[in-house]
Structure formats: C-alpha cells, structure tokens
Amino acid sequence: MAAEQDPEARAAARPLLTDLYQATMALGYWRAGRARDAAEFELFFRRCPFGGAFALAAGLRDCVRFLRAFRLRDADVQFLASVLPPDTDPAFFEHLRALDCSEVTVRALPEGSLAFPGVPLLQVSGPLLVVQLLETPLLCLVSYASLVATNAARLRLIAGPEKRLLEMGLRRAQGPDGGLTASTYSYLGGFDSSSNVLAGQLRGVPVAGTLAHSFVTSFSGSEVPPDPMLAPAAGEGPGVDLAAKAQVWLEQVCAHLGLGVQEPHPGERAAFVAYALAFPRAFQGLLDTYSVWRSGLPNFLAVALALGELGYRAVGVRLDSGDLLQQAQEIRKVFRAAAAQFQVPWLESVLIVVSNNIDEEALARLAQEGSEVNVIGIGTSVVTCPQQPSLGGVYKLVAVGGQPRMKLTEDPEKQTLPGSKAAFRLLGSDGSPLMDMLQLAEEPVPQAGQELRVWPPGAQEPCTVRPAQVEPLLRLCLQQGQLCEPLPSLAESRALAQLSLSRLSPEHRRLRSPAQYQVVLSERLQALVNSLCAGQSP
C-alpha cells in the first residue's frame, strides 16, 4: 500500500511516535522468524473515566489516517539502527523499510459511540511485527481523544441542551497536538464551537471568538479611527460617525443608570467603537476590564444603541471575572429596563457569555434554572481533564496464528479476554442499552427475542437475558489496508454521540454514583477463559 499524502502533515502521528520496546520486540519477532505470524490485538480500557459509567469512542479518523500513511522513512530506519545493537543484521532494517499496513485489518466502534470497559474500541489484525509496532501510536491517538470527548459530554450533560458551550482551552492545552485534539473532540463530545482556528481549518470545527482585555486596554480614548463613519445596515443613506453617535447615547444611558457621564472609561468606549466599526453585525462587549457597572455596561449600551439606530443589533457581552451567575442576572435586568426605556425590544435578548476557570461545579451553578447565561466558555477544565488525566487505554494480544492468547495475572482486573471476538449491544424495547455482550467471533450472531445465557463479570453462575433488539458494535473499517467505507464527518460523529447519550438510561448517564453498565460474556467465551485459567490448551 503506497503511503498517502498527509493533509495535516505534522499534526499527524508518525511511525516513530512509539516506545522503544516496540522496535526491540520487532527485532525479536524478526530474529525468531515470526514477523509474519497472523496476530490480533484489541484496544480497550478497563474502567470508565471520571467515576462515570460511560465513555465515548473517539480518535478513529486519526487512526485511519495514520495507518494509511504508515511507512518508515530512510531517516526513521537510520535512527532505529542507531539505537538498536550495532551488530543487528542489516536485513532487518531492509524489512522495516518495506513495511506498510497493506495487510492490516481494523474493526472499530464508530466515533461517537458509547464505549464500556473491556469492549474493544479497535480490533487490529495483521502480521505480528506490524501490528505490534502500531500499539503505542494507536493508544496515543485513541486514548486522549476518547477521554476529552467523554469529558466534554459530561460538561454538556451538566449544561443541558440550551446553553451554548465554547471550548477555549488552546493556551492551556498540553502542547499544540494536545490543543488540536482537545478542540476536535470536545466538539464531538457536545461543545458547540472552539476558539482554535487550526481546528476550524483542519477539522471543520465551528470557530468563535471576539476580543480580549488587551484590546480594550490598548485604547486610551484619544485615538481617532481613519474612517469613523458607518453606513446604515440597509445600505441606504449617509454614513454616521459612530463614536459621536455613541457619545450622544452615552449621556442618555448614564442618566438612565444614574451615573455621571465622566464615569465610563473613554478608552474602553473607544475600543468598543473600534470593534463595532470592524464587526457592526457581530458586536460584542467585554465588560469587566475596568468596572462592569460604572464603565463596561454603560459603554456597551451606548455603542449598542448607536449601532441599533443604524439598523444593526449587538450580539452579546462577555464576563470573565467575579460572581458570573449574579452578574448575569443583574445585567439581564439592566438590558430589560433599557429595552423598555429606549424602546428597543431586541436588547432584552442580547447574549450573555461567561468564562473564568469554569469546572463541573461552577457549570452546574451557571446552568441552574433562572440563570441568564447563554454561552459558557470553558478552557482548562475541558482540555486538561483535571479529574482524570488519562483514559488508561491498553492494547492487548488476543490471538496468534488463529489460537487464543490470554494474559494471566494475580490481579483479576488485568486479565485479558482471549480470542477473536464479536461485540453486541443488547437493547430493550425502548431502544435503551441493557448491556454489552462479548462472544467468540465464530459464534452465531444473537437474535432479537432470543434468550441468551450470559456471564456477568465475576459471577459464579450465568444469567439469562432476552433483548428486544441486538446491535452489532464493531464495524469493518480497514480490510487489508483498504478503507471499507467512507468515515462519517466530525459533525455526524458528534450527532451520533448526542443520540447515543440520549438513549442511555438516566441511571447510567448520571455523573455522580451512576449505576454500572454491565459487559457480559457468552457461555463459550467464559468457558474458554476458564480453560485457559486452568492451564488447559484451547
């Protein structure tokens, strides 16, 4: 399979984004004559993140891009030669130069699907040496993407469907790649937009942003714009000096608010006028550079009303400090009173945007009934996942040469499930998930209405379940290196995530002390586990 041009260049994973022991194992396999043994690995996690009962599968598109472009360049091989033993057979490095993923097959949970412990997010099969080399980069691509998508989904559940969520954590992210990944998968998880321009260009994430305090403080009030005139929104009639018009309105606003006309900061007003001249149809004011009540709010109202006289409507205001909930409620009261006073009904519904180190607890307060907040900007708490910085994904060998393999350990949680498997979601009559079931790939596909004997984790006896619907979970994504079907767009995966979460029961969806979702084994898979634990051959 020829290497494909990577449209995102350095933003993508590369073959040497890996741990050295993958290369040392590759040499060991090659030296043992096992490089081309047929093998299968599964990528999964053992516990749902953040103490919850669900995760979202993400990162598949990045994995596909990586696999289709996988080739070791001469420089890669030369570097490996420099860190492997100097007496390594040169034929091994020639073997590396010829590697690609043309014999690799991948089955996967679609991006945006609900994922649960032990259920593979990816099944990767192909020559042993190649699929071993894929372990670290695939974990890197899937684990953080799934973690941040799940984190974003939790924040969306707290915010509810009406609040707009803006991801604005690029400057807080763990490096450029972390920032791009966070912006991409916070959108998949339910955020509405991102401040990250590169995520918009490369991934199609809707972008949003206005102005910072530096823009406001850069103005003193003495500046004269080169063209202070603004034409009416309808395009007819002479232009108007917006700064002069805002000054006229300021006197009326200050009288209405009981302020002296000298109290609002002139530099802040000049900044608002400059921004309004640049964005007359998208004017927003940042209110808390000096004083929300004595400066930011009256200056915003003066400029907004001047724009309104020309047929434009201000979009919103932003708060970045203080008691955000209380300020938003008070600002909304001012907007309603000003709308009535100046007979501009649209002013009542101007958006109120808030930001300032918002975490789950603060978000719950801002989302409560009676909050007047419309848009919530979240940075650090979404991109860094402070409650749990790692998903804990693993990539484990389950079969070699068609024979099952199992990791046996004294820690039952770290035992792996052997063999090539199929995964199914068992659904109730209302379409809500009841449990996921893993079975051996060669077993018959379970049918809706069929009574199934299954083994819950750690159970001493099987139980029975009769699903109303059965949903296969793993889709054939790559077969012998070829894409089997077009991947969904990011927006489509986002829609799937929202639909999947809406179908999950409230007991499993709640964020504190949720009911744990069961992943069960078929009788044949449980029997295989028991035989291998007893030291018997499969």
Swiss-Prot record:
Coiled coil: none annotated. CDD domains: NAPRTase_A. Activity is highest with Mn(2+). Its cofactor is Mg(2+); Mn(2+). Gene3D superfamilies: Aldolase class I, nicotinate phosphoribosyltransferase. Changing G379A: Complete loss of activity. The keyword Transferase applies. 5-phospho-alpha-D-ribose 1-diphosphate binds at T380. Homodimer. This is Nicotinate phosphoribosyltransferase.
